[in-house]
């Protein structure tokens, strides 16, 4: 098949999967008020890949490295810095063209790329072949994948083997000739209810007595024993909103319950190799944080643009303290962009697989997460109190009060009141809404906590070299002894 149409993708989701949202069992995720938005957001990526626009199609569609047949570019295993740069360009283009993030293949391939790289380093040919064969399955059928990493964890102060319930961490409960049987739950899984395949990797390092928790595999979303319990979302645009002429773009997260799920042996990428569990989790995190910083650049560009526009609409663009805030906003965005580019340009090679530079990728994610709330505060400051108290579109459309709003809510004379209100509502969505509060939390915790990023930065940084150079400077070591 190679490249699917959006309708083929939607039809593939009508497969009997077990999905719940707000206590309701969903028979067809493609037609649900909230989950349908996730399907359409991902579907926008399929629409772009099937377009007649050659420039867009060339970005999304690549040639199979062996057969030359068309495949989605996300299914190109990165072998060079250029492959990583192409992945970033692809994510940027998808966001800027569709108005959202069609997270249909990004996280799943982060998992699979990590599984292939680690299987190779383990020297386990069976796992490596399983991963390669599964990649061919994805390429041939153009499937949407989600990555299931975070376990529910229970008491965070206790190891997996010390939990009150052993299935607070997903683990193997049985093995037979057909495969492994797993039990547990993964949580915060983006776009899970609209995925064709689920890729599972360990959430952390496991100990020798936790070998059953060191497990990685791929499984179809409609497999018996799998249940999705989804976060409710915002739903379509309402008549109260000033909104752009495009659909709402939103991705729904889910907790995935694995209740004694049978995974065939040929879909297993790790089973019991606890010594390598951290390596797999670590490698996935590097790939995924690179994906994260790639999609966050166009996201914060829009937010920065809101600040610039609001400064102009409010007549304050040339005021000194506003320009100082805009400089801080621009520095935040451009530092993130520079770090994202650097992570792609200086990869670490795992055999012939190019892994984004782990130190720089984690620095970039830490920069984004640790400074995001200050970034939001700057936009709120520039936008003004109107971000919290603005009238809605139904007020604007009411002829009894429209004149008052038109008259009193104008700003700088170069701009219409309508244009100012449109930008106010756009800015509200980013910094003063239920959606913005959601993103303030996910910025801290998605793709791993700031503590996890600091841990990886410390691990990757050449601390010994820093120390040796200081000793040379102090005369403790001879001059020229440290390269």
Where are these regions (language model features)?
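FAD-binding core of flavoproteins
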Residues: 147, 152-295, 458-483
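Alpha-helix capping/hinge segments and adjacent helical runs
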Residues: 359, 363-483
